[in-house]
Amino acid sequence: MHSTVILHITFFILLTQIKSQTFLPKVVSGKINRIENFKSRYITERNVDIWLPEGYSDTIKYAVLYMHDGQMLYDGDQTWNKQTWDVDRVVTDLLKKNKISNLIIVGIWNDEQTRHQDYFPAKPFEQLKQIEKDTISAQLQRAGRTKEIFHPKSDNYLKFIIEELKPYIDNKYSVYTNRDNTFIAGSSMGGLISLYAICEFPKIFGGAACLSTHWIGTFILENNPIPNEFLKYLNYNLPSPNFHKIYFDCGDQTLDSLYPEIQKKVDSIMVKKGFDNNSWITGYFPGENHSEEAWNKRLNIPLEFLFKK
């Protein structure tokens, strides 16, 4: 009887350990170091996955790419929709072909409950009239993105990256810490927050990749005041084209079908502010939708643009 109880207790402990074990995504090359539940003064705790390329060495300096929605970057067996950016595969291929400089990827997981608040640019939102803010809140509530009155938390999210995460990465890994080697990237709302980051912190980020940028903020165009406010914000806050690179793109299917007309207005602002082929790309991809599979197919373009040797 005693041995049976011991056996059951041992089995329970082992089962608990297995359930609590964190399984890292499988990658084709390199390795992932995970910081579990990175604690912050500014945002909810979340995992951070650092991808190191094959042959990573403390004797070599690496550029850094911060990416949002970190749980969607690798290994489709672990993602909610079984799709992935396959960032490791794309970067490894480009490195083997000597098309990009050495880099590491810092994948910041989203918090499903606060993702929209974390990624929604706060300053443009705050310029809206109260009735317009109420409209945005109502649209997001109907879409299930918030249960309460909507308040962006993106300024705090960027403080987390700048004041807490970047110092950790700079101290822990063999990386360049300057603007010319610090980049940020994401898709959809992740595209918005990447653009907001380079505008708010032009001394920190030298480049941003904004794929399928979610210019509409909510999920409908009708009676939506935020796209125009984003355009106004860019008109006054874009960083210098002399020291920064910005990449945009969009498809024209599913959610991406709502972006091209706004993106063309953004393009006009980029030209007016002095951006040219050396500092800016906008790619239009007819037939492509709003998905990780679509972003994977063209990820090489912004990577080559930002990290070109």
Model-found features: residue ranges?
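Non-catalytic cap/lid and distal C-terminal segments of serine-dependent acyl enzymes
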Residues: 21-309
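Bacterial Sec-dependent N-terminal signal peptides
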Residues: 1-25
